[in-house]
Amino acid sequence: MFTVMTRQPCEQAGFRALSRTPAIVTLVVLLVSIVVLVTLTLIQIRHPQVLPPGLKYGVVLDAGSSRTTVYVYQWPAEKENNTGVVSQTFRCSVKGSGISSYENNPQDAPKAFEDCILKVKEQVPEHLHGSTRIYLGATAGMRLLRLQNETAAREVLESIQSYFKSQPFDFRGAQIISGQEEGVYGWITANYIMGNFLEKNLWHMWVHPHGVDTTGALDLGGASTQISFVAGEKMEPNASDTVQVSLYGYTYTLYTHSFQCYGQNEAEKKFLAMLLQSPSTEANISNPCYPQGYSTAFTLGHVFGSLCTEKQRPESYNSSKSVTFMGTGDPRLCREKVASVFDFNACQEQDACSFDGIYQPKVQGPFVAFAGFYYTASALNLSGSFSLTSFNDSSWDFCRHTWSELPALLSRFDETYARSYCFSAHYIYHLLVNGYKFTEETWPQIRFEKEVGNSSIAWSLGYMLSLTNQIPAGSPLIHLPIQPPVFMGVLAFFTAIALLCLAFLLYLCSSFRTKERSENAFDQAVDSD
């Protein structure tokens, strides 16, 4: 009698199969593949790095009455309470006059931009050209041209639009902004770069500064001037000069007014027109605001061709007729005559009134005066804040200098500006003191500035800040430890290895089960014999 040992076929066959070298190697490879797959998946899921979405760029062309300036701004693509934290990175002055001077040849207007736009392309990373928005805002010069010749104004803008459509940037149009918009954007710029909206705390996070008052803005251009500030007193209901501004989660109620035809250049034309109206039998006209020893000839078209002076045209107006102005350098008479540029009587002793019958609440708090205000003060060797007495003394002293003395007095001599600084000084006095009602006590609260840090004080930055409210924020970028294509490739490779190993092991197990059954059948046959 034989005793037959029983065994589980699959277990014994599987054990014998797995005990052999190929099976062991395959099993090890399978386990390693599974470990690699699990490890890579956990790393990819649990350790992603969230990166900020990078920088965005914007370009604004400030098309003023006398020149065009190109500004490049950048800001983080994520936003602080829906407004981008914008900084100026580049500034370029376009050669030539303002775009309104191309009234008779609008097709030539864009040609002057080419040098600056070429530099802008270098400043903005090439891969961002297509997403960089570019805007052109035209101010008082074009506002006057539109009133005078709407067709010419439209053709100038169309020529510019056609030019920028051929550029790689995302051009968003050329438009004429209103005087009120110019005032608001200038106020936004001044307060932004002075840190009145945002500041960095100890953790380098942007926060709203506690207890900081806003700063009023005084802008003096070539064809208009703007005043903007948050009034301390309650303003007249439904006042057309009241604007609400929302930035960085806060809302400000702002008084702002733009005086068309009261920019430096247009105001001086009004002054020259007034001098021409004075009865005189002399061939030459005395100008107390021009330096002694200086004379220049203008055509009547230069003086009276503007919309601001057409009402002062003489009956026998001949635009090509020339008239010579002789400088006498008389500061007292200059100040006296410059007052006639304004209509102070229209306010009729009203306290809340500036000039020409325009409503204005009482000025209060600090102000920053920029553009023409700054350049005139700089010519008088003044900057920052100073007393009204200092301004008057410097004005009187400057106006007494002869024309031959001015080149040594000015750091940068240009005939057009040099001859007009005396007029501008007395004009600013009347505008700020008799117009806006600044006094001996409040005058020192005005700071005459060109820029703060690396940012120019101009309406263009405020314009860009307002536009970032409308530009979608960038989405955060998820930076994975392994790039998705690489991860998917590695995942597919080790998954395939694991499946092949598993299939091979199943094959070995199946083969040995078949062999074991054959051996059992053979053993039984032998036993029966």
Curated annotation (Swiss-Prot):
Name the Pfam families on file: GDA1_CD39
The record gives the membrane topology as: Multi-pass membrane protein
Q: Which cofactor does it need?
A: Ca(2+); Mg(2+)
Binding sites annotated in the UniProt record for ATP:
G222, A223, S224, T225, Q226
Q: Which GO terms describe its biological process?
A: nucleoside diphosphate catabolic process; nucleoside triphosphate catabolic process
Q: Which residues are glycosylated?
A: N81, N149, N238, N284, N318, N381, N392, N454
Q: Gene3D superfamilies per the record?
A: 3.30.420.40, Exopolyphosphatase. Domain 2
The annotated active site, in chain numbering, is E182
The text of the family note is: Belongs to the GDA1/CD39 NTPase family.
Name listed for the protein in its UniProt record: Ectonucleoside triphosphate diphosphohydrolase 3
| Organism from which the protein derives | Mus musculus
Q: Which gene encodes it?
A: Entpd3
